[in-house]
Amino acid sequence: GLGDVYKRQVECGIIAIADIAMNSENGETVTVYSVAERRGLSGKYLEQVLTSLRQARLIKGIKGSRGGYILNKKPEKITLKEIIDALDPSVLGSDVAVVNDENTEFAQVLDDYIWLRLENKLNSYTESITLRQLVDFYNKESAENVSEPMYYI
């Protein structure tokens, strides 16, 4: 559905900025091509996502022969909320549509009691996670997966 498109965009953006964080730690730039190769993502799609992240000033584009992208600030200063908001502001926003006009009183209760609280929880949760934590978690998980032997029958 339509939600999948948004989810894919957000997911792609999180993966891309995490990849840039992991591969630009020594100041070297990360190209769209290298991210696409490493993560199995479409270069064209990645360009759009990186444009959103650049416009939000989370990453910086460097021009020239050694051009590419770098983080605009330290990964511990970038929150998951900032990343998601840059990619799709509606994900953590209150875009709750009232479907049934005759039932607005109950819809109002849902808005106040459920959706608003859920939105606040999502916002504070994503605000509490930094890009650094995300990268560290990924590195820990992938290291654990590598250390487990695989048996093929």
What are these regions (language model features)?
Residues R8-E11, A18-L41:
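N-terminal helix-turn-helix DNA-binding core of bacterial DNA-binding proteins
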Residues G1-V5:
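Short, small-residue-biased leader/transition segments that mark boundaries at the very start
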Residues K44:
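Key DNA-contact positions within bacterial/archaeal DNA-binding proteins
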Residues L50-T51:
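Short, hydrophobic-biased segments on the C-terminal half of alpha helices
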Residues P75-V99, N120:
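Conserved segment of winged-helix/HTH DNA-binding domains
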Residues R57:
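Glycine-centered, phosphate/nucleic-acid-interacting loop/turn motifs that mediate DNA/RNA or nucleotide
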Residues V99-I153:
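C-terminal regulatory/oligomerization modules of transcriptional regulators
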Residues S65-N72:
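Minor-groove-contacting beta-hairpin "wing" of winged helix-turn-helix DNA-binding domains
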